[in-house]
Amino acid sequence: MSRISQIELDDRNLPPPTPEIEQERKVAIFDLIEENSFVLPKRDERDVPEGPYHLSLSIREKRLVFDVQTEGGDKAAEFHLSLSPFRQVVKDYYQICESYFTAVKTLPPSQIETIDMARRGIHNEGSRVLQERLEGKAEVDTDTARRLFTLICVLHFGG
């Protein structure tokens, strides 16, 4: 099974993330590197270099860019996804995360759990959208899609 062995976020033009967002990002990257599934399918009858891969995620000209290289530094693939299908779910996820971070500081556990369930539901929706958008470009499992979606949110909202 092919996988991502290294990930880089091109966040040079983003404001510094809040401590909560930075923590979410660190956890997503750590978990992604520890366990993921990332397969590049054959395209146009051409073989694709085998992984593991180094993945660079960035936003260029309002498009999400996946730049995939082999561990040896050779280009394996590059694909650009429109951000439009992600806009609403990213916005919803960002808002529920803000509510969650506030709730953790002030609300009882039962109310935090309710917000966390909603957060997980929106996160699942975002990972589903990502899997659909990657169809034919890369195959990822649900956990990998969830972690990548977290990183997309960081890039999309500028930290």
UniProtKB/Swiss-Prot annotation:
Pfam families: UPF0262
Disordered: annotated segments: 1-21
Keyword vocabulary terms for this entry: Plasmid
Signal peptide limits: none
Entry superkingdom: Bacteria
Segments traversing the membrane: none
Homology family: Belongs to the UPF0262 family.
HAMAP family assigned: UPF0262
Name of this protein: UPF0262 protein TM1040_3562
Organism this protein belongs to: Ruegeria sp. (strain TM1040)
